[in-house]
Amino acid sequence: FLQPYTDVNWLDPGCAAEVMCQPDNSFTTEYTNNNSDFQALRNAAAARHLDVNIVPATERQKKRLIADMDSTIITSESLDDLAEMAGIGDKVAAITQRSMSGEIDFESALLERVAMLRGQSNRLVSNLIAATELTPGAIVLVQTMRANGAKCYLISGGFDFMTRPVAALCGFHDHHANHMHVNDGKIL
């Protein structure tokens, strides 16, 4: 039903590929949501932890990548990791979970979590940066987007002490996040 007319073009061998197709129908969202063949393809892909997306050829090359940092470009939640290093991980993770489930708003959760870190040594920050792991494929994603002319931005509801080195390592054009104040080697 998709009628591929190209071989697989591997963007990242074994991880990401594109196949150019000439669909036999207009692939609107409504059509794909109601098409049993497409749903079977999506289900088979999901069973193998793969995503399938249909994008018009005229819109396939993107001009911008805006990526969240925590649990997207890096493998974990940086503020939770910082709290873990400070010995208050469970308390901060519980607030994070309440925020993610909509029980409390983001700003309140952020202020509450940062207040719990007040007075901690800023050495925790350098330890956190050293321990942070990139999600496999993050660098390839940014390099591929840049090679194709896209502007790439890293964003976070966390802090710029993390987005700065992660953005530099991956090759993002710029980064945007909150700023954590430090004075006399202590988190304020």
Labelled PLM ranges:
Residues 1-67:
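Non-catalytic pre-domain segments flanking phosphatase-related domains
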